[in-house]
Amino acid sequence: MAKRVQVVLNEDVLSLGKDGDLVEVAPGYARNFLLPFGKAVPVTPAVMKQVGHRRAKQAEHQAAIKQEALDFQTALVTIGRFTVKKQTGEDDVLFGTVTNGDVAEAIETATKKEIDRRNIIVPEIHRTGSYKVQVKLHNEVNAEINLEVVSY
């Protein structure tokens, strides 16, 4: 049975673990790949103490980010309705469609806060009217906004 060595990861390693994880790996894998490329360090009491401090700091940082997302969610709900103006033809059919970029621009205009368009899930919109749109603000925080599509 082969001996395994314990290392602490300095960064996320695919199929092995995340930054700060204590993992057991084959000695050759540690010696030839993880340690030389700075992806891990051998386990010592000092390293374990550092990992504890780093995890506490990361937890604080994540809590602050989540609180910021919750505050932004409250702001979105308070505003309530966002409007996107699009050119229409007969029977209020849009020329083109409403994209997540259009919604992001409407949110940025109303809130003065930048949001990544990739975090907005827009249903297929081809007519004027009112629609529900999902906005992902954080891994654990989502907001549902009302989008009003009007013609100009």
Curated annotation (Swiss-Prot):
Entry's family note: Belongs to the bacterial ribosomal protein bL9 family.
A single Gene Ontology CC annotation of this entry is: ribosome
The molecular function terms in GO held by this entry are: rRNA binding; structural constituent of ribosome
Instruction: Please name the Gene3D superfamilies in this protein's record.
Output: Ribosomal protein L9, C-terminal domain (3.10.430.100), Ribosomal protein L9, N-terminal domain (3.40.5.10)
- From the record, give the transmembrane residue ranges: none
Checking PROSITE patterns in the record gives: RIBOSOMAL_L9
Query: Which InterPro entries has this protein been placed in?
Result: Ribosomal_bL9, Ribosomal_bL9/RNase_H1_N, Ribosomal_bL9_bac/chp, Ribosomal_bL9_C, Ribosomal_bL9_C_sf, Ribosomal_bL9_N, Ribosomal_bL9_N_sf
Q: What does this protein do?
A: Binds to the 23S rRNA.
What gene is behind this protein? rplI
- Which HAMAP family has this protein been placed in? Ribosomal_bL9
**A GO biological process this protein is involved in?**
translation
The organism encoding this protein is Prochlorococcus marinus (strain MIT 9313)
Pfam families per record = Ribosomal_L9_C (PF03948), Ribosomal_L9_N (PF01281)
Protein's name in the database:
Large ribosomal subunit protein bL9
Question: Where does the source fall among the domains of life?
Answer: Bacteria
Q: Which UniProt keywords apply?
A: Ribonucleoprotein, Ribosomal protein, RNA-binding, rRNA-binding
